[in-house]
Amino acid sequence: MSAAMLLAPGDVIKRSSEELKQRQIQINLTDWTEGETNKESKAERKEGDKAEELKDGEGRNRRAARRKRAAKETKDARCDRRIHTAVGSGSSAKGPGERANENVDRGDGKVGGGGGDADAGVGTTGANGGRWVVLTEEIRRAIESKYGTKIDVYRDEVPAQIIEVERSLQKELGISREGVAEQTERLRDLRRKEKSGAHAKAAERGRRKQGKKPHGDAQREGPEEEKTSEEPASVGITIEGVMSQKKLLSMIGGVERKMAPIGARESAVMLVSNSIKDVVRATAYFTAPTGDPHWKEVAAKLQKRRTIRYTSTGGDVKTEFLHLIDHL
């Protein structure tokens, strides 16, 4: 497919505009929000005009009532001067439209939180100075691809310092379900061996192979050897759960690689649009739940023309839309 035109709902295109520009893809967006805003503004103006008219009417009525009362009072004063000789004509009555001013201080104070990162402050090597390892080949590949840092897979060696990639970081690295299950199985095996003391014995054998105990001292240090072999497996194996990218990078070193976006010359899509005028030229269209009021009509015309349709699977619509563009 070459020089493809993809139609999609306006709000989907608008949300993806930055990524589309990075891919050098043209955008033809019929903005429906301006029309809606104008309608709302007109409605608000009409309501405001009505309110003003009502207010003016009430004001005129109040003034007429005051004049009527003043005229009546003047007439009464003239009719009975003996009673009203010292009476003033001022009125202290408040008009029906007057209200007491309310000065409400809400005091919306903001409480600052000490959102420190609990993952910070971990060195590039473990507690015993050894290098960190991971439990599966898939995790190793993902880390190397994303951060450019080489890391080994655990091969039952003792001692060892193991990174357990937890759920949030699994998503960040794009680990598959199979990869997650493989890590879980290996962790279970490690804990089972830890209970049996197998790793503690292996660690002791490793120390003896390195020549830390001369053969001549074997009989003399026999009881001490037995004592050492009963040490818990935690002496030989360290497992560190990692949830954040920041902590992982502090342990293994490296920085995140920024992937270059797919450009227009690499993608078949040259233009995206939500305009009904582009229906005749559309190669395909992507449809999803939308707030674009015109999209229903556009989609109906595309369907009549039997244009190739791609439908959202219910996940993140923007991600699905960009994935489709990159793979058309």
Swiss-Prot record:
Primary residence: virion
Region (Disordered): 31-128, 180-237
Localization of this protein: Virion
Superkingdom: Viruses
Family classification: Belongs to the orbivirus VP6 family.
Keyword Hydrolase assigned: yes
E.C. number: 3.6.4.13
Coiled coil location: none
GO cellular component: viral inner capsid
Nucleotide-binding keyword on record: yes
Single GO molecular function: structural molecule activity
Purpose: ATP dependent RNA helicase essential for RNA packaging and viral transcription. Possesses ss- and dsRNA-binding capacity.
Catalysis: reaction(s): ATP + H2O = ADP + phosphate + H(+)
Gene, per the UniProt record: Segment-9
Enzyme class: hydrolase
Binding site for ATP: 110
Subunit structure, as described in the record: Homohexamer.
Biased composition regions of type Gly residues, renumbered to the chain: 110-128
Basic and acidic residues bias: start-end ranges: 36-61, 71-83, 96-109, 180-205, 214-230
Protein's name according to its UniProt entry: Helicase VP6-A
